[in-house]
Amino acid sequence: MINSMCGSSVSLKSENSRNKPQPTSPNESVLQSKKNATQSSADLEQTSLNLTPPSLNLPALKFDLDGDVEVQSPDSSMWESFFSDHLLDGDFMISSPVRNNVPSPQASTFNSNYNYAHQGIQSQSLSGCSPPRFSSPLGAFNSNKGKGLSPLHRVFNSPNNQYMQHVENLALPAIEEFLEEYQGDHGLGGGGGYSNSSNKVSSDIGSSSECFDMQNHIPSMLDSLTMQNSSRYCGSVSEDSSVHGGSSQLSQDSDFYHQMGSMASASLSQALQQERYQEKQQKQHQTQQQQQPQQQQQNLTVPIPIGMDQEQDSGLQLVHLLLACAEAVAKEEYMLARRYLHHLNRVVTPLGDSMQRVAACFTESLSARLAATLTTKPQSISNGTSMPRSSSSSCLSPFPSNSIEVLKIYQIVYQACPYVKFAHFTANQAIFEAFEAEERVHVIDLDILQGYQWPTFMQALAARPGGAPFLRITGVGPCIDSVRETGRCLTELAHSLRIPFEFHPVGEQLEDLKPHMFNRRVGEALAVNTVNRLHRVPGSHLGNLLSMIRDQAPNIVTLVEQEASHNGPYFLGRFLEALHYYSAIFDSLDATFPPESAQRAKVEQYIFAPEIRNIVACEGAERIERHERLEKWRKIMEGKGFRGVALSPNAVTQSRILLGLYSCDGYRLTEDKGCLLLGWQDRAIIAASAWRC
């Protein structure tokens, strides 16, 4: 999803302050401005521009040394493009661990009584190992000013959805027999995942107590959806000539939909009676071959809610169609899946509401999986059509993953949503506190990219009472040239801030790292930082990597990962979890950007759609988005000899301040055993934790 490429947006200038008192904390200007701020939301937004100390603001990427000597930053168009848009923007500095906590800003329009406990969403987990999310709401950010639940969330929270009510009995509707059939070599998931008990389906997975007949109701549901004449989000797999009987099947589909269309507006009982009558008539005029498409729809059990308004019902039916299509793909009922995709491609659009947009991404991903399955094995699916994957060398993105255009798209996410800022300054705060009073410090960044996380951290070290320590950063990345360029830029910044600095580049994949590459030195305090990166390390290499990190005896290890379970062994479970997770993200984008926003469309197309495609369409080594929940990471880290370190009250306070700077009230901050989770409404999105040996 969002990784360290998004980075910190900061101004890069220091100023000769010999005639000014030394700040006792790099966050002092933030704290003072917050003390004088009023409680209105307008004033809250005004303070967002005062978070960077005045001594660090400049209208250009220049570094002053002694007032009259000027050093121009290196000619790095990528850095200049990234930072130039944010020279006037504030950013979060790091609180000294000795400072007192500051209350969170609270706008007068906030309602602190907001509580989602009645929704019961915390019982949603396919793997059964999710922590009790959002059980300890923090501050004034549990407000009800945000959006209501999306159609997908209403599916999960509907009282009619019996299979969504209890975590120990969470069920995918009527698939237990299918899962049993795939216990052996025919499983559709897994492959390179982390080994633990969640890699097999729990026997607690059950089905709703009442069987729902898809044969009777899916056709009417299809016709009741609003047809759109806009261009399709992706090509329909039903038009693929590689599928046998394509033209004749389309004709049968048309007849089938026409025959069942009159049921759309009828009540449930009337629809059943009318269908039975039509079936009797069909038996007299149709052959057994024409009846097969109807017979293939048996045992697909997705409940259709009754009594909702038309808009909600349309969104819910769209969700049911996606689940039915995913189940057909999982059961290898390809002709039936083709028909669902044919209809989905007619009703979804990347320009509609959040439910339609996320459905468009999942529809395209299902099409890619089905198309590849019909021509080759899922393991060979590549991510190289209309949905680029920035992490794959085989993707056919309109521009390279490290181009200025992509960086600008990441910057849009960084500015519009708090997820990346939360990851960076929470990790930086933990590292800063672990380095207190240390004279020589060493940071190993396991995914340095452009190094955007570190300018604010370096500013904090420069403002430390007593002067900055000697700082060494080891940057790891797959491309040594890019890592070296990042080191050159950070070296220039450190020089402008008068920080003794050294950069050590390592051009390797994480699974290929060796202990000597860290260049560990005696007398240095060590921190290891990983933001949204460890989930991509193959399971067979993850244990060795963590053991090697532990042997380096770091003072602190900061781990930030997406709070989702996308590494289960079964395709249908991963699909449902991903649908829930990305629906929440698209909802947050919907509340952040204006309607018909071109920026939002770029974010969804080039950041989140490739992730969805990788989770849904790819298998084996090609499936790299293997997100795990915080509880799973706890087991992994503790199993390798690490113990958790509670994030400090300063981290909590600054997270509250961060959320107060965003106009949307849907963001939620919670604590879980010393860790912090940031989410949207009732769904956790990202989790931050700290560890020691």
Curated annotation (Swiss-Prot):
Localisation: Nucleus; Cytoplasm
Location of the region described as Leucine repeat I (LRI) in the Swiss-Prot/TrEMBL record: 316-391
Annotated spans, SAW: 617-692
UniProt motif LxCxE motif: location: 323-327
Protein's organism: Lotus japonicus (Lotus corniculatus var. japonicus)
VHIID: region residues: 410-475
Motif window: VHIID: 441-445
Entry function: Transcription factor acting as a central regulator of arbuscular mycorrhiza (AM)-related genes (e.g. PT4) required for the morphogenesis of arbuscules upon symbiosis with AM fungi (e.g. Rhizophagus irregularis). Also involved in restricting mycorrhizal colonization of the root meristem.
Induction description: Induced upon root colonization by arbuscular mycorrhiza (AM) fungi (e.g. Rhizophagus irregularis) in roots and root tips. Regulated by a complex comprising CCaMK, CYCLOPS, and DELLA during AM symbiosis.
Any one GO CC term of the record: nucleus
Subunit structure: Forms homodimer in nucleus and cytoplasm. Interacts with RAD1. Interacts with NSP2 and TF80.
Region (Disordered): 1-43, 233-253, 268-298, 378-397
Effects seen without this gene: Ineffective symbiosis with arbuscular mycorrhiza (AM) fungi (e.g. Rhizophagus irregularis) with abnormal AM-related genes expression, leading to rare colonizations characterized by malformed arbuscules.
Top-level taxon: Eukaryota
Biased composition (Low complexity): 284-298, 386-397
Region (Leucine repeat II (LRII)): 485-516
GO process terms (BP): arbuscular mycorrhizal association; regulation of DNA-templated transcription; response to symbiotic fungus
Any Pfam family the entry gives: GRAS
Residue ranges of the region described as PFYRE: 526-614
UniProt domain GRAS: residue ranges: 309-692
Name of the protein in its database record: GRAS family protein RAM1
InterPro entries with a match to the protein in the record: TF_GRAS
Single GO molecular function: protein homodimerization activity
UniProt keyword annotation of Transcription present: yes
Family of this protein: Belongs to the GRAS family.
Keyword list, A-Z: Cytoplasm, Nucleus, Transcription, Transcription regulation
Tissue specificity note: Present in roots and leaves. Accumulates specifically in arbuscular mycorrhiza fungi colonized roots.
